Regions:
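Extended, helix-rich architectural segments
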Residues: 1-202
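C-terminal anchoring/interaction modules
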Residues: 1-24, 28, 306-530
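Structured, contiguous alpha/beta core segments that scaffold functional sites
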Residues: 10-12, 16, 23, 147-323
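Short, Φ-rich (hydrophobic/aromatic) sequence segments
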Residues: 62, 66-78, 111, 115, ...
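Alpha-helix initiation and N-capping motif
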Residues: 112, 124, 184, 287, ...
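Short, well-structured alpha-helical interface segments that form or flank functional binding sites
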Residues: 138, 285, 352, 356
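Residues in well-ordered beta-strands of folded domains
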Residues: 144, 164, 240, 438-442, ...
Length: 530
């Protein structure tokens, strides 16, 4: 393993490298912010507690509405706090998932319920809309994951531009450099007075709310030793330090077994560090054209309502008015007063173009898809019916949803590890010891994409029953009833607590067989006595 001196100079060099890469996309991010989210970027850490940015380029609320609806749709469709949107299983090796005992399935259900309760008690759901807004506009968003004494877990969403990241050879984010501001009071309380710079110590008592720029850097540890309890030998190295202030030491140097950041991303182009394919980029040309058309419409209406006038030179110094009943003396010319331009702007055509651009922007942010799902849900339709109505639209959403699921899996994996360290997991059945946990998503959107499996099963059962009735009754035995019911329950997201285990069914069959045997024996005895 290559020896590396993990000092402040090393991490400042790494920060500069990551910043150079990020600076290449910075103009694009600013362009997106100007039209969709003016207050979402913070390229300079010290730009905090500033007045809200008012973009002069936004002349219509369509972009705001499209982004808001996208975030709301993702919350409702993918991660609604009011429904079970994920469940826990065991990694599907050699079809092992389908061979789990009832006790194992019940443990998985209880573990997933524990994770849901922790997420609900934390600030996770309050922050997710902001994550989805950033993801929709800028194509990526970053969230921190921290252990919390009161709620087990705590999360933060970072402003766009306040951090840089890089990936490993598999395309997985494994390095994050975050720049942020912290008050002297918070620095002393968190890291101790003796670990802070002289500048912090000098203002701590007199001006505790003075802000200082801080860097938090996490990357793979080149001194990593698997299973080591020593912080310096954990899988990821973590350092926190002040920018400048003449210090060479760290506020804190630690290590993590699990990466403490999760990055939500849209699609990347090859080996690019940052994504370049997503809603914001696709909708930007329409947004620019929309604002231009809004401006032209305003000019046209203004010329019609309040045009510039022309008249005789003799009227120059006379008082004129367009008030009702007022008499304007025309002089000798008889030409009167009339608009300079006798034009009829094509206002209707402009309005049609504007309406089309608005719909394009909303469609790019999947507003029509989410509206369809919510409207059909209100009429009591199931995810299966939604899928039958607009299956092609769900297919369009599928790539982005898979990217979101990848990030959510990382959060749930980190949360499982935190539960295990805190000792609050349910007692693990012996058959699951050493097995790898698998997360399956069962949200409205995920279920809609899986609904075709349920339809296929129902058609197969109907077909087999008809064949058995028409051709040979023995054909009904082709259906493995218990397996079909278990699979149906899995696809339909039925709680295992609501399903009797196969062991109980086997016991019932045994009881029925014994009763039938006893009845037959009694009949034989009665027949013999006669």
């Amino acid at each position: 393993m290559e020896n590396v001196k993990y000092d402040k100079k090393y991490f400042e060099q790494r920060r500069a490298e990551l910043k150079n890469i990020f600076d290449q996309i910075k103009p694009d991010l600013q362009d997106l912010a100007d039209y969709f989210a003016p207050n979402a970027v913070r390229f300079i850490a010290r730009n905090i507690n500033k007045p809200h940015v008012k973009s002069k380029k936004i002349l219509d609320s369509t972009t705001f509405i499209a982004v808001r609806n996208f975030a709301s749709g993702m919350m409702t469709g993918a991660t609604s706090p009011t429904r079970r949107w994920f469940k826990t299983g065991i990694m599907n090796r050699d079809n092992k998932k389908n061979k789990m005992s009832y006790a194992a399935k019940l443990w998985c259900s209880n573990q997933a319920e524990l994770s849901r309760k922790i997420l609900y008690a934390s600030n996770f759901y309050q922050l997710l809309p902001e994550v989805y807004e950033q993801l929709g506009v800028f194509l990526f968003s970053c969230m921190t994951m921290e252990k919390d004494y009161d709620n087990v877990a705590n999360f933060k969403v970072l402003p766009i531009g306040s951090y840089y990241y890089s990936k490993d050879g598999r395309g997985v984010v494994d390095t994050v450099c975050r720049n942020y501001m912290e008050s002297a009071k918070n620095l002393v309380e968190r890291y101790g007075l003796e670990n802070c710079s002289d500048a912090v110590q000098q203002v701590y008592k007199a001006r505790p709310n003075d802000m200082f720029e801080i860097v938090h850097f996490v990357e793979p540890n080149r001194e990593y030793k698997e299973g080591s309890p020593i912080s310096a030998q954990k899988k990821f190295i973590s350092v926190t330090y002040e920018v400048g202030n003449g210090t060479t030491s760290f506020l804190k140097k630690a290590g993590f077994d699990k990466f403490p950041y999760v990055v939500f991303e849209a699609s990347c182009n090859g080996e690019d560090a940052y994504p370049s394919k997503g809603c914001g980029i696709y909708a930007l040309p329409d947004a620019k054209q929309l604002m231009s058309m809004i401006k032209e419409l305003g000019k046209a209406v203004k010329k019609m309502v309040s045009p510039a006038y022309q008249g005789s030179a003799s009227l120059k110094n006379k008082r004129l008015s367009d008030n009702p009943g007022f008499f304007n003396e025309d002089g000798d010319s008889g030409a009167g007063i009339r608009p300079i331009h006798e034009v009829n702007p094509q206002v209707l055509d402009l309005k049609n173009i504007i309406a089309e651009l608005r719909e394009n922007i909303k469609s790019i942010f999947y507003n029509d898809l989410f509206a369809m799902i919510l409207n059909t849900a209100e009429r009591g339709r199931t995810a299966t019916e939604v899928n039958e109505l607009k299956e092609e639209k769900l297919v369009l959403l599928s790539p982005l949803l898979e990217q979101i699921h990848t990030a959510l899996k990382q959060i749930l994996d980190w949360l499982f590890n935190t539960e295990m360290e805190a000792g609050i997991l349910p007692e693990v059945p012996q058959e699951l010891e050493g097995e790898e946990i698998e997360i399956e998503f069962i949200s409205t959107l995920a279920q809609a994409m899986k609904a075709q499996n349920i339809s296929s099963m129902e058609r197969f059962i109907t077909f087999t029953a008809n064949m058995a009735q028409a051709v040979d009754p023995v054909l009904i035995k082709k259906i493995k009833g218990e397996k079909m019911i278990d699979d149906y329950a899995d696809f339909a997201n039925i709680d295992p607590n609501q399903i009797a285990p196969n062991e109980e069914l086997e016991a019932l069959r045994q009881q029925q067989a014994e009763k039938q045997a006893q009845a037959e024996q009694m009949q034989q005895l009665q027949a013999g006595s006669e």
